[in-house]
């Protein structure tokens, strides 16, 4: 989520987020070129004093303004389709977690381990430390190992929710009575923040998500303390 003095996209913490950042830059370059061409054409038409009153058609210019948009769309569509395929790729996961949206907190279950279940509530503002973010800190962080394929299953117990962590390119709807899944891998240690991205009631803004990425050794130690 956006934090103080943070502009543009967040730093990617997964391979897919890095690919999406590259695609964003690629698309912005295409849009810049289109803006320059259209701006030059408009300026030329408005400022030139020369006109051709006898011109009835122009096959060349009609071919150009038909072909150029088609070529531009191809250059945007091909990497976009590749990313859509990668986002839906469900490779073998080493760890599976289940997150359940409730009004207004999250419940987590580590289904690969015994008795690893907990709830996460937003930390009140009067209990925050000086290095913690308002409306983004929780009492129990979700700890996961880095460089490990993780599958997250989402559901809800009451109304629609959405489990979203932008730095990991994750936004999975949590629907009552259904299980949705997403795959991701964290490639560096750190804290990654998210929030519920589906309006779910009065306290919708107070459902933060905090994922703590650690090494395998520290993750096993955390598991032993939770079990």
Swiss-Prot record:
Membrane topology summary: Multi-pass membrane protein
Residues bound to Cu cation A2: 196, 198, 200, 204
Annotated Cu cation A1 binding sites: 161, 196, 200, 207
Classification via PROSITE patterns: COX2, COX2_CUA, COX2_TM
BP GO annotations: ATP synthesis coupled electron transport
Entry's Gene Ontology molecular function annotations: copper ion binding; cytochrome-c oxidase activity
Family per similarity comment: Belongs to the cytochrome c oxidase subunit 2 family.
Function per UniProt: Component of the cytochrome c oxidase, the last enzyme in the mitochondrial electron transport chain which drives oxidative phosphorylation. The respiratory chain contains 3 multisubunit complexes succinate dehydrogenase (complex II, CII), ubiquinol-cytochrome c oxidoreductase (cytochrome b-c1 complex, complex III, CIII) and cytochrome c oxidase (complex IV, CIV), that cooperate to transfer electrons derived from NADH and succinate to molecular oxygen, creating an electrochemical gradient over the inner membrane that drives transmembrane transport and the ATP synthase.
Name this polypeptide is given: Cytochrome c oxidase subunit 2
Name of the gene this protein is made from: COII
